[in-house]
Regions:
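Exposed beta-sheet edge and beta->alpha loop/turn motif
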Residues: 103-158
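Bacterial N-terminal signal peptides that target proteins for export
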Residues: 2-12
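Short solvent-exposed beta->alpha transition segments
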Residues: 53-107
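Short, aromatic-enriched amphipathic alpha-helices that serve as compact interaction elements
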Residues: 35-51, 61, 65
C-alpha cells in the first residue's frame, strides 16, 4: 500500500513540475491591465533569460509587446530576431542586470531610461518608449513599445 501511495505522490510531483515548466514557457500577451513600466520590465526580463525555456523565447516575448507600427518596421519576427542579435542590441540578450527609470509620462506616452549590465560587465543606456494603443481591437488601450534607442556605452563595472 505504501508503494502505491509513493507512486501516486511521485506522479503528482512530476505533473506539478511539468505544469510549472509549461507556464514559464507561456508568452505573456498585452493587456490594458499592464502598466507602461511593467511592459518594459516584461521585455527586459525575457531578454535577460532569452533562451529559457527555449531558443529565442525572450525575443519572441519582446516582439509580443511591440507596437504594430514597430512590428511593421522591424518584422517579420525572423527579421526582428536577427536585428536583436546584431551589435546594436545583442547586449540585451542574457544581460545580468537592468534598471528602469521613468523619465516622462503622459496619458498616452511613457519614456524610460534603461540601464543594462551585459554579460561582459559593460553598462549600456537606452531610451525605451511605450505608447497606449488607441485603435479599436484586441490591443486597444494596451501599452506597447514604439521605440528603443541605440545603446549608449557607459563603461565597465568594477
Amino acid at each position: 500500500m505504501n508503494q502505491i501511495k509513493y507512486k501516486f505522490y511521485l506522479k503528482i510531483i512530476l505533473l506539478s513540475l511539468l505544469l510549472v515548466k509549461a507556464s514559464s514557457a507561456e508568452i505573456l500577451k498585452p493587456s490594458k491591465d499592464v502598466d507602461p513600466k511593467k511592459v518594459v520590465k516584461i521585455q527586459l526580463t525575457a531578454l535577460m533569460k532569452n533562451d529559457i525555456p527555449y531558443k529565442d523565447r525572450g525575443i519572441i516575448q519582446t516582439w509580443e509587446f511591440a507596437h504594430p507600427n514597430n512590428q511593421k518596421a522591424t518584422g517579420p519576427i525572423e527579421r526582428f530576431i536577427n536585428m536583436i542579435k546584431t551589435d546594436s542590441y545583442a547586449m540585451l540578450l542574457n544581460h545580468t542586470d537592468h534598471e528602469i527609470i521613468e523619465t516622462y509620462m503622459s496619458k498616452n506616452v511613457a519614456t524610460f531610461e534603461v540601464t543594462v549590465l551585459d554579460v561582459s560587465k559593460k553598462y549600456y543606456k537606452f531610451k525605451w518608449q511605450v505608447e497606449k494603443y488607441n485603435i479599436e481591437g484586441a490591443l486597444k488601450d494596451c501599452w506597447l513599445t514604439t521605440a528603443v534607442s541605440q545603446p549608449m556605452p557607459l563603461g565597465s563595472s568594477i
